[in-house]
Each structure stands twice: as C-alpha cells, then as structure tokens.
C-alpha cells in the first residue's frame, strides 16, 4: 500500500499544518515539521493505518492529545481527497486515530495491479529527483580460484543474487560483481608445485579438473608451511606474476579458467548472473591507494609497514588498531585490494564504475575488516556524501547438531554435493507421491520438477532466515510440503495455475470488480502489501521479509479459496474472485522470482 500511504500521508500532513498553523510555522523555523506519525495499523481491528503523533505533538501544540486528535479529524473530514481514501476516522485511547480505507480505494488499487507488470511497485526513476541515479554494485559469491565452492559460498551467492534482483526490479542499474580470489601467494605455491608434479597443466587447457586442482593446492600449502626452499620458490613465482612473466601468466590464466568453468556450472544450476572481476583487476590501482593515503596524511610507517591507524577501533592494549596497507616487504594484502576496489568503483566513468552504492555480501566474520576498510575510504574522502558503502553480513550454515555444517569425515560440504542431495531427495519424494496417487508422468517431467523443487528448497530455506543469524540446515524441513518452505509456496502457485486453467484468462475480461465477503477483503489487503515489502527489503537488505510476506499471502489465499466458492460462484462474483486468484499467482511468482526461485505450472 505504498502509493496509498504516500497519498494519505500527504493529506494528513496538510491537514495538520492547516489545523495548527502557528505550531507548523514554529517547527519549520528550526528545520522540522509536525509529524503525524502515520503507520500501518498493528491489528486489523484498528483499521488499515494509525495516526500516532498526537501524544508527541501535545508538547508543541500545548493541547491534550485527544483535543489534537479531534481537531485534526475535523480538518480531515473537510478534505475531499482524504474522504475518497478513508472512511470517517475514529479516535482510540488517549489520542490515537484509526483509519480504514474506503472499499473503492482498495478496488481501484487492485484493478490497477491486474494490468501492471510491476504489481504496484514504483520505479525509482519515476521520480524526477532520482533520474540521475548512479549504479548500485552488489559484490557477492567471491570464491577462490583453485578451490571448490562449498556451503559457505551458498549464502553469499543467493543472498547477493536476491538483493541484486530486487534492486533491479525497483529500477536501479545493478552491477553484479564476483570478486574472486585470483591473485596472491596461493598461485606461487600452486605453480611451483605443478611444475614438479603436473607441468603440462601449466601450458595446456583441461589437463586436470578442479577436484584434482584442489588436491594439488592442499599439497602445495602443506609444502609451503613445511619447506623453506619451496616457500622461497613460491614467492619468486609471485614476483614473476607481478612482473608479467609470460610463462607465469599463461599458467595463471589456465588455472583461473579451469576454476571458472566449475564455478559457472554452479551458477548455471542456481540461475545466477554475475560478472567476474577478480582481485587481479585492481593490481594496477594499488599504488594509487598508497599515493592517495600519503597525500591525505593518513599513511603512517610502523615497524617498516605502511598503515592507517583506525579511529574508535582499539586493540587489547587500548591503542588504535592499524589497517596495514603495505607490508614491510613491499607486498600488498586484502585490505589494499579492497581499498583499490572501493576507490575504482566510486570513481566516475570512464575512470571507474561511478557507483552510488556498494553492497558487500560476506559472512559476519569479515565485519571488522570491512569496518576498517570503509573507515579509511571515508577518511580519504573517496566517498561522496550522496554515496553509500554497506556490509551485508550473514551467519553460519549449521548442521542439525548446531555445529558448522560438515561432512561425516569432517570436511567442508561441497556446494555441488549439497545441491545434488537436495535434488535427489526431491525426486524420491515426487516418485513416492506419484505412486501413492497412481499418477503416470514422463521422466522429463519428474527430472524438471525434482530439479526445480530441490534448488528452490535450498534457496528458500536460507533466504527465509534472518541472514544475520546462523541457521540449521535440514533437508527434511526444507522439502516439507507444510510450513514456511519452498514446496509449500510452489504448491500454492501450482494450485492457482490449475484454477486459472479452469477459469480462463480474466485480466482483460473483468470490467468492474465488486467484493462483499470478508475473505475477499482480507486477501485484497494482503496483496496490496507487496510494494511496501519490496521497498523495505531494498532498504534493509533482508530477503527474509519477502519470504515471510509470500508465506502469509499463500496462507491468506488458501483460506480464501477453501472458505468461499470461486469456480462454482455466480457471476459477477466468479470473475472477480478469479481475478484475485490470478493476481495472487502473479504476486507469488514475482516474489519467488525476486528470490531467484523458479516456479512450476504442475507438480
């Protein structure tokens, strides 16, 4: 009800200023305004909205809250625009004002959504002020080359994808970046080791697969930790890379490409669109970071290293912690690369991305790292006042024992294996149900449905949790047909698709909607919340709010369909109720799509 709220708030604000002109003028001089505190009603019996500002305004207006409410109501009742939106207001308690929307207002809003691909969600570029919006960068997934994607990458990948989808839906230009770990000491170790055990892999594509590459990396890391000579050789290889040695760069490119192929298989399965821009991209800009921080007077030399001491972030000794920008040996680290990335991303095109907002989706363990990096970027004055950089942290994926999810042998769970298991379990469940119902379906149907449900279950189980907290991973819970799960929502979409097939396409045939049953109005009000939920998720970056809304909408719809006739109703009720079914289906499908979840017509 975002548009209704905006219009209503405008009328209430105007009425408040007209009713109390002296107080309005007084607060305006101090740069403030009389705030009516218009909010969504907390309970259905309080109507649709509540004006809660009378108690706070009493101190300014010098009247009792109830007197203020009575005067404001009188002013509102003389406003024709307000009366077209709301029924006569009611005072509750010491001065709260309850507002209930006119049925005609609700019907007009529902009618407009029936023919609106955006389902009432306003585009940011509809506003003249925001026509020159800068791009938004969402930095997510970011696996390391020569390592397989594991369950820890799941959260960053699907949370980041959902955030990017929602921002794009609102009209922002979104740049999806995969900041892969494609540079550094690990490549020196790996190349040095492969020169001895698999030299062909450094000159020829597809000689080894990623699984073998991971094992080679583990062995290289072990040798690096135990053998000083190997350690020195590895560092020399890193120097060769940094100097642009052709053989070293060829080997590096082959290793990156091998990993990239495997990453893309996962992204294809999850339907993730993302542009790779690894750490190596920012190598040419690292010296610029040093130069900028030196000019700004932020860079300090400490024990041979160049660092910036952070404000308000102290170590155990009570002294400010340093953010190391350049090590004593002249090398750079993650913080330097992240600063170079921020600097590049905020610079205007063509020298950078020209971003107005950068969102980093990583685990909460990196919160302190980003707090330090963001602080330095702000103190260096790289961040314009109109721009934002944000860390979107998330908790751990745990097993049902409450510990970090691991395989039986204690290894980190590979993301590929987790997806395979989800699809396999979904397939077994589908085959069992088909057998119980004595239904015959093609193998292609079973494969498509099991793949869709399996992937959807994994995504939704994660996204439906508050991302800040840890959550316990359970195949049984996520694949259940009851409760706040993907299968439950997918079944609701399938149910509506079946109703629509029987009822026909009504988007163009319903001329005038008319409703009388409480179940209809309850569903209408729930449908109209979609826009405000999307706007809230855009600001708070909490996809679980959208999940909760879709679950509530599906429950409200099921009660509506179970309690009153739809297909067997008399006209015009039949067509009007079918229109609500169709709009509910569209809303559920769009909401699931914004979570990166595909839907089905049949299950």
UniProtKB/Swiss-Prot annotation:
- Could you identify this protein by its name? Arginine--tRNA ligase
Q: SMART domains, alphabetically?
A: Arg_tRNA_synt_N (SM01016), DALR_1 (SM00836)
This protein's gene is called argS
Gene3D superfamilies tied to this protein = Arginyl tRNA synthetase N-terminal domain, HUPs, Isoleucyl-tRNA Synthetase, Domain 1
Give the source's domain of life in one word: Bacteria
Query: Which reaction does this chain catalyze?
Result: tRNA(Arg) + L-arginine + ATP = L-arginyl-tRNA(Arg) + AMP + diphosphate
What organism is the protein native to? Prochlorococcus marinus (strain SARG / CCMP1375 / SS120)
Q: What is its EC number?
A: 6.1.1.19
Which family is this protein grouped under?
Answer: Belongs to the class-I aminoacyl-tRNA synthetase family.
Q: Which residues form a coiled coil?
A: none
């Amino acid at each position: 009800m975002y548009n209704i709220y905006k219009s209503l708030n405008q009328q209430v604000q105007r009425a408040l200023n007209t009713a109390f002109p002296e107080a309005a003028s007084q607060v305006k001089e101090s740069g403030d305004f009389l705030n009516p505190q218009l909010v969504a009603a907390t309970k259905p019996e309080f109507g649709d909205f509540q004006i809660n500002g009378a108690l706070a305004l009493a101190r300014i207006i010098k009247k009792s809250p109830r007197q203020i409410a009575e005067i404001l109501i009188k002013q509102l009742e003389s406003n024709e625009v307000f009366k077209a939106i709301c029924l006569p207001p009611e005072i509750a308690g010491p001065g709260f004002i309850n507002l209930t929307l006119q049925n005609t207002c609700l019907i007009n809003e529902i009618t407009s959504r029936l023919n609106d691909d955006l389902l009432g969600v306003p585009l940011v570029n509809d506003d003249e002020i925001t026509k020159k919006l800068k791009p938004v960068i969402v930095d997510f997934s970011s696996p390391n080359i020569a390592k397989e994607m594991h369950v820890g990458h799941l959260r960053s990948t699907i949370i980041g994808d959902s955030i990017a989808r929602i921002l794009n839906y609102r009209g922002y230009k979104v740049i999806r970046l995969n900041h892969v770990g494609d540079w550094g000491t690990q490549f020196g170790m790996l190349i040095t080791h492969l020169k001895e055990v698999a030299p062909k892999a450094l000159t020829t594509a597809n000689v080894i697969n990623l699984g073998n590459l991971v094992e080679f990396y583990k062995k290289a890391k072990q040798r690096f930790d135990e053998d000083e000579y190997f350690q020195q050789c590895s560092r020399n290889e890193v120097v060769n890379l940094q100097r642009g040695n052709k053989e070293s760069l060829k080997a590096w490119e082959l290793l990156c490409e091998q990993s990239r192929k495997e990453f893309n298989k996962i992204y294809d399965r999850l339907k993730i669109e993302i542009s790779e821009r690894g750490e190596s991209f920012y190598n040419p800009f690292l010296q610029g970071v040093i130069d900028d921080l030196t000019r700004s007077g932020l860079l300090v030399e400490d024990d041979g290293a160049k660092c910036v001491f952070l404000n308000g972030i102290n170590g155990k000794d009570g002294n400010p912690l340093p953010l190391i920008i350049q090590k004593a040996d002249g090398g750079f680290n993650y913080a330097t690369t992240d600063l170079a990335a921020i600097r590049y991303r905020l610079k205007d095109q063509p020298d950078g991305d020209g971003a107005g907002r950068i969102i980093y989706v990583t685990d909460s363990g990196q919160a302190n790292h980003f707090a330090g990096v963001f602080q330095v970027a702000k103190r260096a004055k790289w961040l314009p006042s109109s721009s934002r950089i944000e860390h979107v942290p998330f908790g751990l994926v745990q097993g049902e024992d409450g510990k970090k999810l691991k395989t039986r042998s204690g290894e980190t769970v590979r993301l590929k294996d987790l997806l395979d298991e989800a699809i396999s379990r979904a397939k077994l469940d589908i085959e069992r149900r088909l057998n119980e119902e004595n239904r015959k379906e093609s193998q292609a149907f079973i494969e498509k449905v099991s793949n869709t449900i399996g992937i959807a279950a994994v995504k939704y189980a994660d996204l439906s949790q508050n991302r800040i907290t840890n959550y316990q991973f359970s195949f049984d819970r996520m694949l259940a047909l009851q409760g706040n799960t993907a299968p439950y929502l997918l079944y609701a979409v399938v149910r509506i698709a079946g109703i629509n097939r029987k009822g026909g396409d009504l988007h163009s045939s319903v001329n005038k909607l008319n409703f009388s049953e409480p179940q209809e109005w309850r569903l209408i009000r729930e449908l109209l919340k979609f826009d405000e939920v999307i706007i809230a998720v855009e600001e708070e970056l909490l996809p679980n709010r959208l999940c909760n809304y879709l679950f509530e909408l599906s429950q409200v719809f099921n009660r509506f369909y179970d309690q009153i006739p739809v297909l067997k109703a008399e006209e015009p009720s039949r067509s009007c109720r079918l229109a609500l079914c169709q709009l509910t289906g569209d809303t559920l499908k769009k909401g699931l799509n914004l979570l990166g979840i595909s839907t089905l017509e049949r299950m």
